[in-house]
């Protein structure tokens, strides 16, 4: 974030990032608190018990903010499924290793905001204890999922979902089509599933390309 003072001669820049490190935690914690407001709003908009939440992860801030919101605002705790690109699965690899794991990204994911090679410190402290499952999804499902969400046949209204808003839906469809995994997660016809989407068509050019490709 760049800040410009009122005096033209007094110009300075300040970078605000949501990635926490050993000596930089306060701002990322505020960012995560902001993410948790989504959960507060959702808890007020439905009386249904949400059984599962699918939430995407880059460095883990959004996912950890959702978990914190669930703990604060939900009366019953759903299963939490964290989803990330298979080209940048730093959360999955960290949880498997039971320690922060820095991975090597051989090729960047099309889900650019989630193409991260290392988790943020504060989210790690939350997700290592509170996420039920971690899964990774492939880039080749992004375009058709973007197009599917845009199609009014899929929902009551057209859903404008950019590349980073698709992972939860991709994971849900994939897991639901696997009988063994479906039983493991206790996914049923009467499950109430919350899928978090984190962006619209932020990159208009890329969004149009994904729609075109996904509709073929």
Each model region followed by its residue ranges:
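Structural signal for conserved beta-strand scaffold positions within catalytic alpha/beta enzyme cores
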Residues: 15-18, 82, 136
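Single conserved hydrophobic/aromatic residue that forms the stacking wall/gate
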Residues: 1-8, 12
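Active-site-adjacent helical/loop segments in soluble small-molecule enzymes
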Residues: 38, 119-188
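Conserved Rossmann-fold dehydrogenase catalytic segment
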Residues: 17-26, 140-145
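A structural micro-motif
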Residues: 13-14, 78, 132, 158
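Glycine-rich phosphate/pyrophosphate-binding loop at beta-loop-alpha junctions
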Residues: 22-129, 182-216
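Short, glycine-/Ser/Thr-/acidic-enriched flexible segments
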Residues: 21, 141-142, 166, 200-202
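The feature captures the short pre-catalytic strand/loop hairpin that immediately precedes
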Residues: 18, 101-108, 146-151
């Amino acid at each position: 974030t760049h800040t410009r003072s009122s005096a033209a001669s007094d110009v300075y820049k300040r970078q605000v990032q949501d990635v926490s490190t050993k000596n930089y935690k306060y701002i990322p914690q505020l960012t995560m608190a902001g993410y948790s407001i989504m959960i507060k709003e959702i808890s007020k908009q439905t009386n249904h018990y949400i059984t599962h939440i699918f939430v995407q992860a880059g460095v883990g801030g959004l996912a950890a903010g959702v978990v914190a919101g669930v703990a604060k605002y939900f009366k019953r705790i759903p299963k939490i499924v964290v989803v990330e690109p298979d080209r940048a699965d730093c959360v999955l690899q960290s949880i498997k290793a039971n320690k922060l794991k820095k991975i090597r990204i051989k090729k960047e994911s099309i889900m650019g905001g989630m193409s991260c090679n290392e988790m943020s410190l504060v989210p790690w402290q939350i997700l290592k204890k509170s996420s039920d499952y971690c899964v990774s999804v492939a880039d080749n499902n992004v375009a058709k999922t973007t197009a599917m969400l845009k199609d009014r046949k899929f929902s009551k209204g057209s859903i404008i979902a950019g590349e980073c808003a698709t992972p939860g839906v991709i994971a849900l469809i994939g897991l639901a089509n696997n009988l063994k995994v479906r039983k493991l997660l206790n996914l049923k016809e009467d499950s109430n599933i919350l899928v978090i989407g984190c962006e619209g068509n932020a990159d208009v050019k890329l969004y149009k390309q994904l729609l075109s490709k996904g509709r073929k």
